[in-house]
Every structure is written in C-alpha cells, then in structure tokens.
C-alpha cells in the first residue's frame, strides 16, 4: 500500500470523492503543511496554524496509480484559485500536493504540467514534502456518508461526486 496526501478545499469534498474510487483502501481527513503541532479544527480555521485541510489516501498501486489519483484531484477542485474553493476562503483551503517520496514529487510536477493544459488560468497548487499529518476530529471523518442530507453535502459535495462519476474512472462496487 502507498499513501497520497492532498488538499483542495474542504476535506469533506475530497474525502467523499476518493472514498468512491476503486483501489483506495482508506481516506482520512486531517491537517498538514502548517507549523502548529496537534492542531484542531478551530485553530486551523482561525488561519493561525498554517495548516491546510487535507486528506491522506491509502491506495493499492496495483489497482490505481499515484498519477491517476492526481488526475482525480484536478477534477475534484479548482486548482487555479488561491486559498479558496467556492465560498470556503482562507489558507486552510489552499490547493496543495504533499509528496511522500521524490518519485511522487516528480509525478506531481508532471501532473501539474499536464493539468495546466485544461485550465485557462494558471494552476496555483503548492507542492511540498509531507512533514506531518494530523487526523481531524472524529466528527469530520466519513462526513458525507454520515451527513448526506446536510445542506453543504447536498450543494457542495454532491456536485463534485457527480462530476467524478461522469469521468469514467472506476468506482468501487457496493460493499467494497
């Protein structure tokens, strides 16, 4: 198993999309790329920790490649808006790829180059080495699955899931 750590707006959105993808074993919402140890949601939202809302994805590279995970990343958020996704504004919502190895860094840079051909504005996604990942509080985990009728889920997360479903990427079978 390998890991990928990505930030692209509210972690609930990326979590919900990647939980559907075949070859993904787990998705954990959390915080990374800041200077505060053991941050919590309130401190991250204050903008004082430097952390971004991120997801840490554990995946089977025999089923899905890191590069494919990045392709899904580009369709799951807008990488051309600095420190914002829709109405979510602040550095905690920045677009960021946190690589786990030199090979992931290389693939991230290649993926940005390729993705840039599909956007009219420049990609502002940061690429940094992952130093530490802090899982978010329990109530943030599996958010869409446990709160599907919540307004944010309906108006923000569901359209991202629908967009993913239209791509043709493999979707997990029921019960897997």
Curated annotation (Swiss-Prot):
Keywords: Oxidoreductase. It comes from the Bacteria. The active site is at residue 10. It is an enzyme of class 1 (oxidoreductase). This is Peptide methionine sulfoxide reductase MsrA. Gene3D superfamilies: Peptide methionine sulphoxide reductase MsrA (3.30.1060.10). Coiled coil: none annotated. Has an important function as a repair enzyme for proteins that have been inactivated by oxidation. Catalyzes the reversible oxidation-reduction of methionine sulfoxide in proteins to methionine. GO terms for biological process: protein modification process. SUPFAM superfamilies: Peptide methionine sulfoxide reductase (SSF55068). The keyword Oxidoreductase applies. The gene is msrA.
């Amino acid at each position: 198993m390998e890991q990928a750590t990505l930030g692209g707006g509210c972690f609930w959105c990326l979590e919900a999309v990647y939980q559907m993808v075949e070859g993904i074993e787990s998705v954990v919402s959390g915080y990374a790329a800041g200077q505060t140890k053991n941050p919590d949601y309130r401190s991250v939202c204050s903008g004082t920790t430097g952390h971004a809302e991120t997801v840490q994805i554990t995946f089977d590279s025999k089923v899905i490649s890191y590069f494919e995970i990045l392709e899904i990343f580009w369709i799951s958020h807008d990488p051309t808006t600095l420190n914002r996704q829709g109405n979510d504004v602040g550095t905690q919502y920045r677009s960021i790829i946190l690589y786990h190895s030199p090979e992931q860094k290389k693939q991230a840079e290649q993926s940005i180059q390729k993705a840039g051909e599909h956007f009219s504005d420049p990609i502002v996604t940061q690429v940094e080495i992952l130093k530490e990942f802090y899982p978010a509080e329990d109530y943030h985990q599996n958010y869409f699955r446990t709160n599907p009728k919540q307004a944010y889920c309906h108006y923000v997360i569901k359209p991202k899931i629908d967009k993913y479903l239209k791509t043709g990427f493999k979707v997990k079978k029921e019960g897997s």
